[in-house]
């Protein structure tokens, strides 16, 4: 189980969960709500770092937003920096999957001195819904099915069984081999979604574009993506790699949106090799 912490910052009180040993690593997602059961993506990093899994404003037991603008991506980054300061870290690492990766990019751009490294998995620096290869594009054959699942998941009246069934269906759409779902998602981990944060994200994201700022990122960056990702298609990871100087890009040929589960051994070794190279560089300095 992950250990809960309530942190008071200059921007309010935030709930986070910690696990692992090593240098501090920040991890979050734009609209997920975490708890003591943790997170599959976060688990990968607990062998190399002390992971801080953060419930953002309006998620879990963190401070509530007074106005929707407080849920914007840039305000979220200011919240993360305030949490770092409250924890008395001068720097920390960051790893993010999907919208978590999007936040990681913006963090590295906004506070270039705060991150020792950045891992971005299945994310994008611009509106990934603009391509019909993305399931969130109206031309995608599974667009309406996915929208129906998302809207149903927003309901506060779902039973735990109903929520689990809807979440399973939503996740299976984003697996290269859906039949392997049970072998990937076997841990007693349960998360929920902050409807307010999801709605704020959907309002902001169509106008979101960090392409021109990627070249300013100096943080050591690893970018990975499943070759068959239908949420954040691989072309967006390639775009990030081309925009961020000296970044490393590793595609996962037999994965969709969850390479850390679909090709777990390969993903773990890729992550560990990345951090090993960072330590070697720091030793040589």
Regions found by a protein language model. Name each.
Residues 116-152:
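Flexible "cap/lid" loop of the alpha/beta hydrolase fold
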Residues 101-112, 118:
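Short glycine-enriched nucleophile-adjacent loop
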Residues 228-232:
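Acidic catalytic loop of the alpha/beta-hydrolase fold
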Residues 8-69:
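Conserved HGGG/HGGXW glycine-rich cap/lid loop of the alpha/beta-hydrolase fold
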Residues 154-204:
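Conserved alpha/beta-hydrolase catalytic His-Asp/Glu region
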Residues 247-285:
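Catalytic active-site module of serine/aspartate enzymes centered on a nucleophile-bearing elbow/loop
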